[in-house]
Amino acid sequence: MRLVYKFNIGQNENISSLCKISNNLYNQALYIFRETLSKEDKWLSYFELDTIMKNTKNLDGNINYKLLKAQCSQQVLRIIDKNIKSYYKTVQDYKKHPTKYKEKPGLPNYKKRGSEFNLYYTSQSCKIKDGKIILSKDLSIPIPQYEKYSDLIKDFKQIRIKPLACGYKIEIIYEVKDTEVSKGREEKIASIDLGINNLVTLVSEYFTVLFSGKFVKSYNQLFNKILAKLNSIKDLQKIKGITKRMKKLYYDREQYIEDVFHKISRKIVDLLIDSKITKLVVGYNKGWKQNVNIGKKNNQKFTQIPFARLVSYLEYKCELAGIEIVINEESYTSKCDSLAFEKIGKHENYLGKRRKRGLFQSSTGKLINADVNGALNIMRKVVGDSCESIRRIIDRGLLFNPVRITNVFC
């Protein structure tokens, strides 16, 4: 499995210069592809584009391709090739299913002139030595916590440098051996329901845990307030595009969400390992943000939480721990009565009902947290009602006394 060790660095003139060359190469190669397609009706392959760019000069008379290391230039062209192939597949799908799309797909766009684009270094074009990434004789990047990660990253596959509002994100891609899912052990299952006030509701026969999402919601509310203020200032000054302060605001939010999601996913997987859970079921509907309709305010709260990223963090951490993870759609799981084993699906009348916000009244006469009810139904969707884990979860009564975690930073 491939993993990424990430860290950020500040502004660097040498890296900035290389990123601008990368941006110029991207735009130049894309222009040649589009012109060839328009005039000759020919799709240039990666190899054809690579051959052309090796001899194509820029406006200053230099060859962008040769201003970077060969492997870096090749990786930029591969990104273009990947984007073009993705466009082609999307167009073919659009012709068959036009209703899936809001508008007709377009060719990849040019990057902003004078801006910066990613750099990609393979193990052939750079090395890690003495706690530093050596990009050239005059350019190296210190690696934080090198002693902790040195054994993992010494045989890296690729290093990516991504421009940010306040510097650069460095990503070291390395490989680890996959941990096999243990077989022969007694199956123990946990399930997760994702939401807003309760970001994660985790249910198993050993624990019922609610990870509060209110601090994420509060952060997003403050983010929206500041962004609205910056937008009004920008409009008054008649500034086009996004300002530096807005870029910094987006950057800070990105860092905050990434940190929170890593901490939550780590705590979840640690709980699963301690309880010897063998399978985790996660309720997640792909594309649910596009069609969500839970009111204007709730829509904004919901769509500003990148649940797909949290799910991806859980996937790779469970895989490393040898825990099987199943991603399943969660339709009607919040409406059906889990304690009464109501069949999960659409009904004219449901056995249970919402007593008040966050509380579900079961037809068995018991009250249960609404998100806990949803999490248990997500598990039922995958393993069925005859599964011993379902019976044990209900019998042990931990469903009715969930533990709430409001601070993931300690």
Positions of PLM-derived features:
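Gly/serine-rich nucleotide phosphate-binding loop at the start of the catalytic core
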Residues: 1-75
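Stable alpha-helical structural segments in soluble proteins, enriched in small hydrophobic residues
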Residues: 25, 29, 72-87, 370-382
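Substrate-contacting helices/loops that form the catalytic groove of nucleic-acid
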Residues: 38-55, 59-60, 165-311, 389-410
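Short polybasic amphipathic segments
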Residues: 124-136, 199-203, 357-363
